[in-house]
Amino acid sequence: IPAGAAPLGRSSDVIQDTPSQQTLIGMKTNLSSLTKSEHPIYFGFIAGVEKYGEEMLAFNSSTSNSGQYFSYGRQPLFLNLGGATEILRGIDVGLTARVTLHADAELYAYTDLQGNTSLESLNVSAKPSIRPIFGLNVNWAETFCGGGDCAFDGIETALSFRGHSNTETRVEATTIIPGTIPSPGLNLAIATLDAYQPDITALGMQYRQERWRVGLTLEYQTWSDLSNEFESDTIKDQANLNFQDILIPRLGAEFRVNDMLTLTGGIALEETPLEGKRSLDVNYLDADRTLIGLGATLELRDPPVLAYPLSLSFGYQYQMIDERDFELTSTDPMVPSNPYETVNTKGDVSIFSGSLTMKF
């Protein structure tokens, strides 16, 4: 709902309607067969790419005069590599490295006033940024009762920590225009980050019975550190962005209908980390949201053609974004006054997912 001193001439009330198609591939295996020990040691990896695998480095960072949502968009390539093992009876630990890319590009060229270049030199490099992920899981019955009949039957708790990560790009260009801009030339430098994930600490508990289980997780995300990260972002450093840490409760349940079909469902309440109504030039939009998810898993123990069991999973998540007011501002000298537009935003997001799992 636009209003203000100089509202934009919008063709519709839709600010953002851009689909994202992410593909994940992963594997888990027991490495104990490679050693003389029978103690299980598990290794796994998961990789994510955008647009069904066609975009390895999907990336976008820009200012916006019409407003842009903070939380949604394409995700660039990432890779998680990790291992896990049982250290004590009923106590499992895991350690993973999350790998993202930090890219650098340097351009040096002579050019004329028409933009024709000569004597070009271009250098592009990308280096990995590695961040830790740690997990701990405790099966109370196995730990305290050795797996026999116990008052703690079906109770498990888990603790995890994921270090912050992002994708960063730096571009530095130097141009010389003979007769206009002599050596050492005009230097243009841009540094920006995208796909930021904060430090996340999660504590969860589940109660399991023969055919069902229910779990509750509290997830603490330290978004306040992002304010300092944006100080070195040449696209967003003027926005004076401030973020708050948030606590997200998640509740989920699973019910096994029969040997083939399992149903799942869950709900989460997520507060926005974005503080304030203004972010100069960038004009970020975000609000609290409620997440509701439903899913089903079909396990085929004797699928046609294949010699091993096959699992097919399907899920749907609906996100309800609450209403919130924002004031759009700009440093553009053509803008008559600030804020030039006040908008009231709300929306929804639908996420469809499917997965195929083979065990062999």
Q: Where in this protein do the model-derived segments appear?
A:
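Surface-exposed strand-loop-strand hairpins of Gram-negative outer-membrane beta-barrel proteins
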Residues: I1-T18, Y340
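Outer-membrane beta-barrel porins/channels
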Residues: L24-F360
